[in-house]
């Protein structure tokens, strides 16, 4: 069993972010500690949603509280997804650094959520460059979709050959 710090969104309607990650990871035996970046009515890809972005200072305070309980040294993996505000990037990168300082074997898996090929970008304009320039370089593993891979690599990803070229 691994301990996973999952820093992602929560939605009431639908299954994305922590609303999609926590239960399946628990079902396969992992302990998951969710920290929310937003608490939205639904996925932003619908075009309209309600609910708050969680301030970066609140996210940092939650992680600090976990550290004060000795939890960060027990983290085996950090998982991040939908950022919400652009100030969350610093909190995530800092949390990863704290975890890795306490457990050098811990890994960081980043889902660089930006959008998709069908509906385009559904995050604020500040998020994609932050993901590309700050968050993704801190990751051991990234899980971009086709749209996100194209943005991150500045390539046109349209088929298997172009996908393989982009990840090479």
Locations of regions flagged by a protein language model:
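Short, solvent-exposed loop/turn segments at secondary-structure boundaries
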Residues: 16, 46-48, 119-124, 153-157
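Conserved N-terminal subdomain of the carbohydrate kinase-like
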Residues: 1-117
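Conserved phosphate/ATP/ADP-binding segment of small-molecule kinases
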Residues: 123-168
């Amino acid at each position: 069993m691994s301990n996973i710090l999952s820093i992602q969104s929560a939605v009431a309607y639908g299954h994305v972010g922590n609303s999609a990650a926590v239960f399946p990871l628990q079902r396969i035996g992992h302990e998951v500690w969710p920290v929310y970046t937003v608490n939205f009515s639904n996925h932003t890809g619908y075009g309209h949603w309600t609910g708050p972005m969680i301030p970066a200072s609140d996210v940092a305070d939650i992680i600090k509280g976990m550290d004060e309980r000795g939890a960060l040294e027990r983290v085996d993996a950090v998982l991040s997804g939908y950022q919400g505000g652009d100030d969350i990037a610093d909190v995530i990168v800092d949390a990863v650094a704290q975890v890795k300082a306490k457990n050098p074997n811990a890994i960081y898996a980043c889902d660089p959520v930006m959008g998709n090929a069908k509906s385009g970008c559904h995050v604020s304009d500040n998020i994609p460059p932050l993901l590309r320039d700050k968050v993704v370089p801190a990751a051991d593993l990234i899980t971009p979709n086709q749209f996100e891979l194209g943005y991150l690599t500045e390539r046109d990803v349209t088929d298997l050959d172009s996908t393989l070229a982009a990840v090479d």
